[in-house]
Design a protein with these regions (language model features):
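Acidic, glycine-rich two-metal-ion catalytic cores of nucleic acid-processing enzymes
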Residues: 196, 212-323, 327-328
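N-terminal leader/targeting and assembly helices and adjacent pre-domain segments
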Residues: 1-213, 299-302, 315-330
Length: 330
């Protein structure tokens, strides 16, 4: 008998992966446009003499124009993620509940309470994207002012602005560097290409002095995209499960080389309490409280799971769905 609990949990996870990849690609295009628009704005609005920035008044006046660019492009993208992306995942959760069955029919569909939670989570995540927009509006405007104050060359300001937006993936006039950036962008999310991507990143770091871990808009946006999608799924799934009276949980997902040890151990049954590898909610919370690891995120483990960029998910079940040997029998 097919394990439909596993099947539909993996269905949720795989579609989260696809959604993240889709919106990461559109994020890249959005930030590339922001990068181009900000540089064009700076080139148009900031006077120079012998290539050096010379007028503080223009540097101050540019701030609201930078804000408009980020609000138009970035918040437009964020609105699509939190509306279209979240709605799609909510419908997948509903489909999984209907397919697994064995709970009251009224809880298999999205209820009024579920829809209210979905609206709240959309607003919460969009507000976090808005915070990123405001933060980087200030950082970009500050860089314009600071570089103008000391009369630096425009080309130096351009480099700082580009890397503040896209970090290691910012555009470059150097043909070899730009070729590496394009390759990394195209293959970053392909597991089969990770070795080649890492080599390209290493070349950018060593030969072109690019900083992979720097504070940039792409870094924070992609992190929130990942966590926002997966934590939305976790919270809506938990709400529906609690309403349906499901109080046991099981962990699902792939094990890959970068899988954290805590996730690997739970999936492999190191902390198994039952043959089915089910846990009570309290057992999971106590386990997470006792453990410490790199990338651990504060919050309820039912939501944050293994931490930043974790791609595993909990599914809520009834222990009566399993026999004494731990096999699913529904």
């Amino acid at each position: 008998m097919a394990d439909k609990v596993r099947q539909f949990t993996i269905y949720r996870i795989k579609n989260l992966d696809r959604a993240e990849q889709e919106y990461y690609r559109t994020l890249q295009r959005t930030l590339d446009k922001i990068e181009d628009d900000v540089i064009k704005l700076a080139g148009r609005e900031l006077p120079t003499q012998a290539g050096k920035l010379i007028e503080l008044q223009s540097a101050i006046a540019i701030r609201p124009k930078i804000r408009t660019i980020l609000q138009t492009e970035f918040l437009g993208w964020a609105n699509t993620v939190t509306k279209k992306g979240f709605n799609r995942q909510a419908k997948r959760i509903e489909r999984a509940f209907k397919a697994i069955g064995n709970i009251p029919v009224e809880f298999q569909e999205l209820t009024k309470g579920d829809l209210q939670l979905i609206r709240n989570l959309k607003l919460q995540t969009f507000t976090q994207f808005k915070d990123i927009s405001n933060t980087f509006t200030k950082r970009l405007a500050d860089k314009v002012y600071q570089n103008t104050l000391v009369g630096r060359e425009f080309v130096e300001l351009e480099k700082e602005l580009r890397q503040t937006i896209n970090g290691i993936y910012s555009k470059s006039d150097d043909r070899e560097a730009q070729k590496l950036v394009s390759f990394i962008k195209a293959n970053k999310n392909k597991k089969s290409m990770q070795s080649e991507v890492d080599k390209a990143v290493a070349t950018l770091q060593s030969k072109f002095a690019r900083d992979r871990a720097g504070d940039n808009m792409l870094k924070y946006s992609s992190q929130l995209l990942n966590d926002g999608l997966r934590e939305f799924d976790a919270q809506v799934n938990a709400k529906k499960s609690f309403d349906a009276g499901l109080t046991f949980i099981k962990y699902f997902g792939d094990i890959i080389p970068t899988t954290r040890q805590i996730c690997r151990d739970v999936l492999n049954g190191r902390y198994r309490k039952r043959k089915s590898n089910l846990f009570t909610i309290e057992e999971v919370r106590q386990l997470w409280q006792r453990q410490s690891w790199s990338g651990k995120k504060s919050g309820d483990p039912l939501v944050v799971r293994g931490g930043y960029n974790c791609r595993h998910q909990w599914t809520y079940v009834n222990p009566d769905w399993y026999d004494k040997e731990g096999n699913l029998i529904i």
